[in-house]
Amino acid sequence: MKNLKALLVLLFSALTVSSVAQNYGNSLPATDALGRKLPSAKEVGAKREKYVGLFYWTWHTNFAHMDVCIPSEYIAKAPEAAYDFNHPIWRKDITSNFWGEPLFGFYRDTDKWVLRKHAEMLAAAGVDVLFFDCTNGSFTWRESYRALCETFMEARRDGVQTPQIAFMLAFWPSPESRTAIIDIYNDLYKPAEYEELFFKWEGKPLIMAYPEMLADVDGDAEQTAINREVREYFTFRPGQPVYNVGPQRPDHWGWLEIYPQHGFAPKKDGGFEQATVGVSQNWTAHNGLSAMNMPGAFGRSYTAKNGHSKDKEAVARGLNFQEQWERAFEIDPDLVFITGWNEWIMGRFDVWQNQPNAFPDQFDQEHSRDIEPMRGGHGDNYYYQMVANIRRFKGMSSEDVKSQSKHKICIDGNFADWDGAAAYEAIKGNTIHRNSRGWGDYHYINNSGRNDIVGARVAHDANNIYFYVECASAITSPKDNAWMRLYINTDRKATTGWEGYDYILNRTTPSQTAVLEHSAEGWVWSKAGDAEFKVDGCRMEVAIPRKALQLDDKKPFEIEFKWVDNSQVDGDIYDFYLSGDAAPLGRFNYLYRAK
């Protein structure tokens, strides 16, 4: 009996997908809403020792008691208010101005449900380090950065190779900046509770700050000792605030520039440590540094080559962003600094840089610089554009495609015959529930997390394609709503079916067999066949006839697929980010190649 139990444990262990640290989306295929496919390993070449940093804002907590205001909505009602600071349409009470609504809502940076989403999305993108914006005074947003560190460490324990962290302090060696660096050193770095997250450069934790603020102090041995301790702990790269002049000292790093960007921190071999890539810039040709609502501001649709695009759809294509990436490829630095991920908010001033009723850093969809997906508008286009360019910059070790010869599976609940089948990993621990306050009166509740998908397998023979899926715990009843759906793209085209998926399994609640349905176009499905399936504990296996998928039994084929459980909104691909579990996340798919 003991030997039998040991054998069963070994068999189960062989089939259980291990949770190893990896950026599992780095090499998966995806196609964005514009039909742009992510490049493959063959297209981008071998992996290189390059790094990607992303500007990240942790200040979405301290002022979150304020109500949300979206200025473009007010201006749509009263266009004359655009340049009138005192127009009565503008609220006199305290509000916070958002240029649009994030996909995850008007969240606070302490919302661990959102932080976990960020961890997975940025790991899948191949981002190496997040730079926290602490450029204003001595603010470090402790509550937020500690929530992020805790969540990222939890994600790492679940197998997510999250980005590491660094801070960018003020653009000059101010007393407030010294206060900030002492605070984060004592609270975060010296205790080293989250040392695994510290991004190092030249062997030390990196900080974008000016070391001069930590100079020795004549006559004050105690402060001198503190300054030396902190000064010796970090590698310093001071931030250059100006967009058009490049580095003004050998150790300068940039954060945002207009095209053509400069290389920063020249190296002995003639290369550069760093260069910037921005989504847009609060700059105009006639005024230089400008508010984002100044006419002529360099928005998302602007390029130095062609000026301001008049195409209404250009804002969705990231023209400015792509031009900046092309320049970064020319510079070929060690690290690209991207601005940015999730700023979202901006102040409003009577006059700033000659602009009345000025919104300095953001304004509307066109005049904003966030990559994080938004509700409506350009959706997640900029996220996948970033992923594509990170792949081109860093290269790829290999394409995550599984190739296999014929391998017959018996659908009998005995999973031993899956040993040796093509295996795919999925991140565990991402079905946590959400119950968090947002900005103002917003409160977000999401209890859709249910079956936590942790792995998948595929096999085929002349008659069937076999799918296996594994969850972290026992799979719930097939009678549950939106239960364990399998999406299949049989032609690898995004223009056919629904969002490229030609077939869906389990859209209709299964009975003795599962129902396979086909889409000719959009979220309109018709029955294509039945599929035998078996669930046992945390595992399920399915056999789908090749004829039902219109896949010739003699020809090799490639398919993309994904598993999704408990989606809440049919026909909305953005629900893959928001509800239940999707493996892999968002628009990413697994790729299977039959020999």
Which sequence ranges carry the predicted segments?
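Acidic/polar low-complexity flexible segments
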Residues: V401-D412, D419, Y487-A514, K547-K595
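Beta-strand-rich interaction surfaces with strong enrichment in secreted/lumenal proteins
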Residues: V454-R457, A528-F533
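Short coil-to-beta strand junction motifs in C2/discoidin
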Residues: P478-R485
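Acidic, glycine-anchored loop motifs typical of Ca2+
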Residues: A221, K408-G438, R492-T496
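Short, well-ordered beta-strand segments enriched in hydrophobic/aromatic residues
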Residues: G413, N464-S473, R539-R546
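Residue-level detector of buried hydrophobic side-chain packing
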Residues: L54, L122, E343, F467, ...
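Bacterial Sec-dependent N-terminal signal peptides
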Residues: M1-Q22
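Glycan-processing catalytic domains of CAZymes
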Residues: Q22-C410, N414-F415, A422, G500, ...
